[in-house]
Regions:
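Short glycine-aspartate micro-motif
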Residues: 2-5, 46-48, 103, 163-167
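Short glycine-rich, Thr/Ser-proximal phosphate-binding strand/loop in the N-terminal lobe
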Residues: 3-37
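Phosphate/pyrophosphate-binding loops at sites that engage ATP/ADP/AMP, CoA/4′-phosphopantetheine
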Residues: 35-45, 150-157, 269-280
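Short beta-strand-loop/turn "lid" adjacent to the catalytic site in phosphate-handling enzymes
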Residues: 40-86, 100-103, 108-121
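Glycine-rich phosphate-binding loop of actin/hexokinase-like ATP-binding domains
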Residues: 113-215
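Adenine-nucleotide phosphate-binding core of ATP-dependent small-molecule kinases
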Residues: 225, 232-236, 243-276
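Glycine-rich phosphate-binding loops at beta-strand->alpha-helix junctions
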Residues: 280-303
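Structural signal for terminal/edge beta-strands and the immediately following C-terminal loop/tail
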Residues: 319-351
Length: 351
């Protein structure tokens, strides 16, 4: 069974054709030219659409029926940077591939196992229940893959492992995985909460945001645009949102932006670790987690309080344990392979 995986990020679109039986990638591209990519494939049986926010109703991979499409529309305002892209791609690919089965794969599904104490905001019940104000979590397909792949490299079943995972890319979040299940994560109601990101602020004092609005310093649209597009590494450095550019730049502004970024990632990991009774490994994934050894070193090297140390290998030729032999807690770097998890989940959904 050939599965086309469609993975729209906040600033990218990644397409993969995966043979589900052996999880082999037959073709891939980072392109907006979906039509050309689909046309050059001999057969596509299933299309797996990554949906960043499933809202309260979409909690597992499901066929994109009209009723499901209506629920996706309801979630549009929860992730305005992402969900409309998925809706447009669903429309486009339904026209291009009318005979394929289209499966919607919510990124939030992995975090449905969050215990109520990790899922709940300390807000009045009269707000929480009517409006479904709770922590959903994101990057679920990345965390799912990282859990499975880390277990392979550590030669242990996923159900035996307690992992701290940092997905560091355009969006950044961390997750505590206990016995194969998400038990805590840094993102919440939207993909804006938690760790500092490349352009997004991550968590900031909501009282400060209320002050900016109340005092007329910013409009709601200006505030939203600033928090989503002009904060994070870009906002602090004034140079770039790319860690590679900032490392090579070496200016005081670049170094400071990276230092704040690394500090905020460490803080999120330490907080999330409180949901585990032990840590069997720290896992870095995502474009930055995989391919920016300076960041991994700075983060791991500052987590001595958790028994994690630096001295990591800078080599990134393949998924591997990058901590020194004999490290108390192994550190791994994994290339993110969300397409394999998406293909696997979609194939299971149609069986």
């Amino acid at each position: 069974m050939n599965v086309l995986t469609v993975n729209p990020g906040s600033g990218s679109l990644r397409l993969h054709l995966v043979r589900a039986e052996d999880e082999k990638v037959l073709d891939s591209a980072s392109t907006d030219d979906v039509s050309s990519f689909a046309d050059r494939q001999p057969t596509i049986s299933v299309v797996a659409h990554r949906l960043v926010h499933g809202g309260p109703d979409l909690v597992r991979p499901v066929e994109a029926t009209p009723s499901v499409r209506a629920k996706i529309a309801d979630a549009r305002s929860l992730a305005p940077e992402h969900v409309p892209k998925t809706e447009a791609l669903l429309d486009q690919l339904a026209d291009l591939l009318p005979d394929a089965t289209h499966i919607v794969c919510p990124d939030t599904a992995f975090h449905e196992t969050l215990p109520s104490v990790a899922q709940t905001y300390p807000l009045p019940a009269r707000w929480r229940f009517p409006w479904n104000l709770r922590r959903y979590g994101f990057h679920g397909w990345s965390f799912s893959w990282a859990t499975r792949r880390a277990a392979e490299l550590l030669h242990r079943p996923p159900g035996e492992l307690n992992l701290l995972i940092a997905h560091l890319s355009g969006g950044c979040s961390v997750c505590a995985v206990s016995h194969g299940h998400s038990v805590d994560t840094s993102m919440g109601f939207t993909p804006l909460e938690g760790a500092m990101m490349t352009k997004r602020s991550g968590s900031v004092d909501p009282g400060m945001l209320l002050w900016l609005l109340r005092e007329g310093k910013l409009t709601v649209s200006e505030l939203e645009d600033g928090l989503y597009h002009h904060s994070g590494l870009l906002g602090l450095s004034g140079i770039s949102d790319d860690t590679r550019d900032l490392v090579s730049d070496g200016s005081a502004e670049a170094r400071f932006a990276l230092a704040v970024f690394e500090h905020r990632i460490r803080a999120e990991l330490a907080a999330t670790a409180a949901s585990l009774d032990r840590i069997d490994a720290l896992v870095f994934t995502g474009d930055i987690g995989w391919d920016q050894p300076e960041t991994a070193e700075a983060v791991a090297g500052g987590l001595g309080v958790l028994g994690i140390a630096g001295g990591l290998s800078r080599t990134r030729e393949r998924d591997a344990v990058i901590s020194p032999p004999g490290a108390k807690i192994p550190v791994l770097a994994l290339r993110s392979r969300e397409e394999l998890e998406l293909a696997r989940a979609a194939a299971e959904a149609v069986r």
